[in-house]
């Protein structure tokens, strides 16, 4: 997802029917009628917090070298810390500033996801 997926890029994803998403998987989901591509950062049973140090999963500050923006809470978003319920995942956009993700809408039910991204084909320069 970095650099960000842009209009015209082709996203190829596997229609995942399993419940085996793992942290760092990039998935496709639908939110308010819009397709989103988001990274799974926590799965069922994980505790998620966002502190002054950044993203914290199960008490450990996450090292995210591929993320160039600090992960921050949204003022009108979900309350932290939170524990991801069974059958759900917590997702974040790689472009953290202004991303609509689990900080806004909470955990995502796996049954509401469309699949796991396999590759992105950049078509902007074709």
What are these regions (language model features)?
Residues 2-126:
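Soluble "head" domains of membrane/secretory-pathway proteins
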């Amino acid at each position: 997802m970095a650099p960000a997926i842009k209009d015209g890029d082709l996203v190829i994803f596997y229609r995942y029917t399993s419940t085996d998403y793992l942290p760092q998987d990039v998935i496709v989901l639908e939110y308010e009628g819009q397709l989103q591509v988001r990274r799974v950062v926590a799965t069922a049973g994980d505790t998620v917090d966002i502190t002054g140090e950044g993203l914290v999963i199960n008490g450990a500050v996450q090292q995210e070298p591929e993320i160039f923006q600090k992960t921050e809470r949204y003022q009108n978003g979900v309350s932290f810390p939170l524990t991801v319920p069974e059958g759900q995942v917590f997702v974040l956009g790689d472009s953290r500033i202004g991303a609509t993700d689990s900080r806004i809408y909470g955990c995502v039910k796996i049954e509401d996801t469309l699949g796991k991204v396999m590759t992105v084909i950049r078509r902007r320069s074709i």
